[in-house]
Amino acid sequence: MYNSEKLVYKGEKFDSRKELDFYKRFIEPLESDNFKVFLHPHYDILDSYMLGGLKGRKMVYTPDVVIKNSKGDVIHVFDVKNSIQPNKKGKEYTPSVYMSEGAKDRIRLFQSRYGLPVEIVVPMRKIVRMTVYGTTKSIGLHEFEKIDYDIRDLWKQVGNQC
């Protein structure tokens, strides 16, 4: 989020008020022995490389929040955005997500390398809107009061519609 005010809460830095709001309302209540929360972890999405004797830079993706279960499995990768607009055709169609082309590319590279969906989220007054970007079949736009859902269940629903 460009030109956003950087905030600090409990010693952690947040890129925007929306991101902090998402953390306080949806993530903080989950923190326990069963779930481990990671803020702004770095994932390599393109390794460094040699180019005519020069070293090309690696590329990293930094999601806003990653949640792992007690076994250490990643169960959510969240990227907080300012806006997700429903498709005029309905919530089952691809919604409009406003982000830079660079952000879109990084998300696609992350999903390709790690096989994990990046959940694009926007906290609203009472709910959080969520979609996944970059897939050939849209999972649509979903709204949740809590983030206790399993993204794999949504994949199964979409897969059964194919």
Describe the role of every protein-language-model region.
Residues 1-162:
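Electrostatic, structured charged patches in enzyme active sites and in nucleic-acid/phosphate-binding
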